[in-house]
Curated annotation (Swiss-Prot):
The gene is sec17. The modification Phosphoserine is found at residue 76. Its main location: membrane. One of its GO terms (molecular function) is soluble NSF attachment protein activity. This is Probable vesicular-fusion protein sec17 homolog.
Amino acid sequence: MIADPDQLMQKAAKKAQGTGGFALFGGGNKYDEASELFLDAANGYRLQKQGSAAGYAFEKAAEMQLKTDDKDDAASTYVEAFKSYRREKPSEAARVLQIAIELFTRRGNFRRAANYKMDLGDIFEQELQDTKAALGAYEDAGEWYSSDQADALANKAYLKAADLAGLCGEYSLAIRKFEQVARASVQNNLLKWSVKDYLLKAGLCYMANGDEIATRRALEHFLEIDPSFASTREYQLLKDLQDTIEASDANMFADKVFTYDQLSKLDSWKTTILLKIKSSIQEAEDDLT
């Protein structure tokens, strides 16, 4: 018969508060025993589908493990707390996952920390709608993957950061990340086909940033990154759009976007940035009238 997790929690709390670090007759360290009881309670709550209660019990178990300086087990237990909290209490899930990540980095386990930084970014982005925090998490993950020579994973994280930076209006950061991934991908036969998309996104960020001279220079710079970009529809679109921006012609801008979209469907990210650019053109038109 499975023990009542509530009773296990009470027993664990009493054990943790007991006097003395070790029992007199071979009982072991009180924090070790308390940790085991909290873990048993956590798994009991899981069986009962009580996610929040399980998360709290795992968190208490991790605290006991830290008291015995068992940082590796504590980090893994905080991850279990994160998994349990996530559905019902995403903010608590993010909090305990950050503790786990800090423990992993202190132990030099940056690959595992990067994996959980991606999870943390996803919580901030999807559940908590904290775009700035998500952006920072993805940036950290990319840097840690890169330091571990996991270039494909690093690029995936950098692209997540770039997308969010663009949507936040942090266009310079988005441009740096898109160009960084483009340069890293251009010599890889499996990844080279995606370079035109990264450069298109970087170009749109230049336009959204409102610096026409920088945009023209960027179009030349893109050909240095990938000379074959000159023959793509994406490059032609950027050139056409820049012409309409310099002419302050919102209708022509919309026509060029529509024509491109007929053959290459625009995703929601590009559509959002394009609408921002079009709005800027319309404001410029209004200023001229």
